């Protein structure tokens, strides 16, 4: 990738001059400027932490608020991830994708500057420090589902070249002041040539969200993002984690819990108890069915993200009817069990480069 060698080689001043010519929407920050904005990366300014390092809240001289993602340790791998994220953030412009404000690359400091989103991540509202406040009513959940789907659809169908995110999960869906979704964290993203159906690569991401073909064989495609998004939808609908632990020795993927209930049309039992019954039944049903059709094990049977957007909006009665009558939702004969989820496992990162806490990553960990 051209950008990677661009960051790793050459003088900093040369890099700045070239990048300033290529962008009018973001800029190169000086380390001194970001130190001032974050009170010298003060602990009290820290709003998230992960394997990459830390995220800090900051305020620029003009009063605008920013989130600064600071790499913890410089290394060739970290440099590559930094370069990939800056390049992709610089390429994409969509209301449901996190916007790049700029970057800093001085000495061994690598920092990414983005908009500060005051409502943090989706995971913080479902499972983290904001979950007790119950700020996600049903209308907000539907808006988050559709908005994040539209952001991912942009990556798959409108970006040039196409982009596979490879790390879609609840902690990478951030929420602005109006609870509008912004998909974040492009450090693991891949650019896909027009003539390619997939890329074979080292597996990275989070167990519980990984598509089976990617987890087992390293085959990454847009369909892998669709699978991961299906898991996020189930979390949105149910308030449960991607992998639940009903007992200390049992780990249950959310798909294996939800699918039998969906087949029996027991959607009320899937709904998040924190909603207290305040949801639109038809929309809940739609979200759950879309989630499960996305997260089935066979990639060729998953919808595209454009189809997911259409289904979530419920604009085509014919498509909704086809969804409800899909064979995967037919009740199974007694004694027959069909596992549609990926391999069982913990929700810990499988890559040494990524390690997120439930309430970490308010800019994208």
Where on the chain are the PLM-derived regions?
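Protein kinase catalytic-loop region centered on the HRD/HxD motif
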Residues: 150-163
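A short, aromatic-enriched beta-strand patch in the conserved N-lobe beta-sheet
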Residues: 102-103
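Membrane-proximal cytoplasmic juxtamembrane segment of single-pass receptors
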Residues: 1-98, 107-113, 119-120, 128-142, ...
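Intrinsically disordered, low-complexity cytosolic regulatory tails
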Residues: 1-24, 280-286, 290, 297-365
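Activation segment
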Residues: 217-222
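Conserved catalytic-loop aspartate of Hanks-type protein kinases
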Residues: 225
